[in-house]
Amino acid sequence: VSVRCIEPDNAAYPTALKQYRYSTVLPTLKAIAHPAALGLSQLPKLALFGSSQCEPELVTASVNLAQQLQEVGVCTIGGFHTPVEKACWTALMAGTQPMLYCPARSIDTLKLTQAQQTAIAQQRLMILSPFPPSQKRMTAALAGKRNQLVAALAEALLILHAKPGSKTEALVKTAIAWGKPCWTIPHPSHGHLLQLGVRSLPTLPNSTLLF
């Protein structure tokens, strides 16, 4: 599978990045996807974000919700890097619904797992990155930029967990300012998110209501 370059003037370039500007310069995107699946980036997408430190009961609730998302076919997007995000990734990859994976590094030399290769061949997985070949290793700075990209690309956000004053909370504020729906799992530690305007998601509604 080859790495494709998607310039801002390309018809396959996500229109959301032109509307929700997190950078003064529109990034050139690199994509790994089946040739017939380049349109995955234009689907309505739910972004998943979860802090590195997440209580066990929240991880369980997040995985249960991820299983529901894959069962109803919601297209998800994220970096899937923190433990709770990785747990959701495993649940989501077990389905057949579309997914977008955005690592916080260049994908020019990215080694794909067998599961990723299979999902790409099935035209359900696209891997996207705005980073040049020189940025081969993930850093905190790149992760921050990646998260901004994911939030800009998504139609709605699902906050699995975010601590007060965290970078994830700051991202939520940006998304709400953009007018994007933000959801979170009901939990006593999420009161600050509800005060920001994040909505509680006790059960998965009709998937169209997420957006």
Residue ranges and their predicted role:
Residues 3-211:
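Glycine-biased, small-residue-rich flexible motifs in mid-sequence functional cores and linkers
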